[in-house]
């Protein structure tokens, strides 16, 4: 029996009690270990997310599932853990479900709202049978590519409402947030839009691009219906800085005998874990497991 849980209960509980579940994008074994340790130490709910790119890098959906499940068992993790596909295509969602993922995000935001809803309906017929939770995106999230930062779309309120007439578990919508590092001239989240969407849909809302948003804006977003916040960039930076710092201090790796990759990567694991615990604290999700 799989130790994974779907996200429905943990996200709904967060929504009703004004905290947010951290969704940690995992990139390799070290990321999984760090996130599981952070959740166990703080008694916090945890959502592990893989992008389709990370799935390819880590050897496929079956391998990602096996790594997460086996580490949960080997590390004797008792806190609830959900394995989630982030920004999945229709085909990717099917593959993730078949591999044993307990949650999916279908990203049809680049399609017309009619086609997005149609594909979501089809996926829901499968997820209901499998007990898999569903996140759907309306209004694409911005990001930085080739040095050019896109602010992303501001989601259409009526489109959000139409999507939430379906039995989805959480809604991702563009409210001025972007993936990656926020530029200095970023305008911030559009709280008026977030408030209107929350009042209209009455569903847990997902904030993508959570890395780099101020604590004040995070808390305000949570109070306006955000119940899941995605984190990736800050963990990547923490991991890279920790390894760079350690290797710089080590100097000659042969003379200092600092060439064992397991020992080197342990510094990165600690850095990721500490970053995640900091997010749990700021999202008010500490000790939320009864």
From Swiss-Prot:
Zn(2+) 1 binds at residues 87, 179, 208. Gene3D superfamilies: Aldolase class I. Binds 2 Zn(2+) ions per subunit. One is catalytic and the other provides a structural contribution. It holds the Pfam family F_bP_aldolase. Zn(2+) 2 binds at residues 107, 137. Its cofactor is Zn(2+). Pathway: Carbohydrate degradation; glycolysis; D-glyceraldehyde 3-phosphate and glycerone phosphate from D-glucose: step 4/4. PANTHER family: D-TAGATOSE-1,6-BISPHOSPHATE ALDOLASE, D-TAGATOSE-1,6-BISPHOSPHATE ALDOLASE SUBUNIT GATY-RELATED. Homodimer. Belongs to the class II fructose-bisphosphate aldolase family. This is Fructose-bisphosphate aldolase. The lineage of its organism: Bacteria, Bacillati, Mycoplasmatota, Mycoplasmoidales, Mycoplasmoidaceae. The gene is fba.
């Amino acid at each position: 029996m799989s130790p994974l849980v779907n996200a429905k209960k943990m996200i709904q509980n967060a929504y009703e009690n004004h905290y947010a579940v951290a969704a940690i994008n995992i990139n390799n074994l070290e990321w999984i270990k760090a996130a599981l340790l952070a959740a166990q130490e703080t008694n916090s709910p945890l959502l592990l997310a893989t992008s389709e790119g990370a799935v390819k890098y880590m050897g496929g959906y079956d391998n990602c599932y096996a790594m997460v499940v086996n580490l949960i068992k080997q590390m004797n993790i008792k806190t609830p853990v959900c394995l989630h596909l982030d920004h999945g295509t229709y085909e990717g969602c099917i593959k993730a479900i078949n591999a044993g993922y307990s949650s999916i995000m279908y990203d049809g935001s680049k399609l017309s709202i009619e086609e997005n809803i149609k594909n979501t309906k089809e996926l829901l017929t499968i997820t209901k049978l499998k007990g898999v939770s569903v996140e759907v995106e309306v209004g694409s999230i911005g990001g930085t590519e080739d040095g050019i930062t896109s602010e992303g779309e501001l989601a259409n309120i009526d489109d959000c409402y139409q999507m939430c007439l379906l039995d989805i578990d959480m809604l991702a919508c563009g409210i001025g947030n972007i993936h990656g590092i926020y530029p200095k001239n970023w305008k911030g989240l559009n709280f008026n839009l977030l408030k209107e969407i929350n009042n209209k849909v009455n569903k847990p809302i997902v904030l993508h691009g959570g890395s780099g948003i101020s604590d004040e804006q995070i808390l305000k977003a949570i109070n306006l219906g955000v119940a899941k916040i995605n984190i990736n960039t800050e963990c990547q930076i923490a991991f890279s800085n920790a390894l760079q710092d350690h290797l710089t201090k080590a100097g000659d790796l042969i003379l200092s005998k600092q060439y064992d990759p397991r020992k080197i990567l342990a510094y990165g694991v600690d850095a990721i874990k500490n970053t995640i615990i900091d997010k749990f604290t700021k999202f008010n999700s500490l000790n939320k497991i009864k």
